[in-house]
Amino acid sequence: MNQTFSFNFDDTLSNSSGLINLEKINQNCSPNYQYFKIKFIGGYLHIKNKSGDILEKYDLKDLISLIALKKDYLKLSSPNNKKPNEFTNIKNKHLENRFNLYVINEDINGKITKNGILEEIILNRLLLSILLGNEENLLQIA
């Protein structure tokens, strides 16, 4: 089963918002980890300079990523004070990676990373920024 969430990411040099579809997938790589496929339904990633001017704009529609995190996240309680179905980052806040979340592949279908490693780094940062601190939202995915 999968579920759709909105996401919002904003920091000094980039911002992004849109919709993602999260699907729990069965991988037997490690029994201690849960794997998720993330498909961007819509949204853009903007790269900005220090003045806030947009230097580059990436269409995220149909981009597919794969992540993993320790199953310890299942011990979390469901969100009660956050807007449901939304992944947001907190600007300039250090986020702890409590469940060893990592991005296995930023762009499975090579939609925007075909140009080089810079796009991979930016996507990795985007994914970690919207997921870290929002792990309880993953409890909603059966």
From Swiss-Prot:
Q: GO molecular-function annotation terms?
A: lipid binding
Q: Which residues cross the membrane?
A: none
Q: Which UniProt keywords apply?
A: Lipid-binding, Virulence
Domain of life according to the entry? Bacteria
* Induction of synthesis: The toxin locus has divergently transcribed operons maximally expressed during early stationary phase. This is part of the orfX1-orfX2-orfX3 operon. A longer botR-orfX1-orfX2-orfX3 operon is also transcribed at lower levels.
Is Protease included in the keywords of this UniProt record?
Answer: no
Membrane keyword on record: no
What S-S linkages are listed for this chain?
A: none
Q: Which family does it belong to?
A: Belongs to the TULIP P47 family.
Q: How does it assemble?
A: OrfX1 was not detected as part of a crude toxin extract that includes BoNTA2/NTNH, P47, OrfX2 and OrfX3.
Give a short account of what the protein does.
Part of a botulinum neurotoxin type A2 (BoNT) locus; may be part of a progenitor toxin complex required to protect BoNT during its passage through the host gastrointestinal tract. Binds phosphatidylinositol (3,4) bisphosphate, phosphatidylethanolamine and phosphatidylserine.
- The name this protein goes by in its record: Protein OrfX1
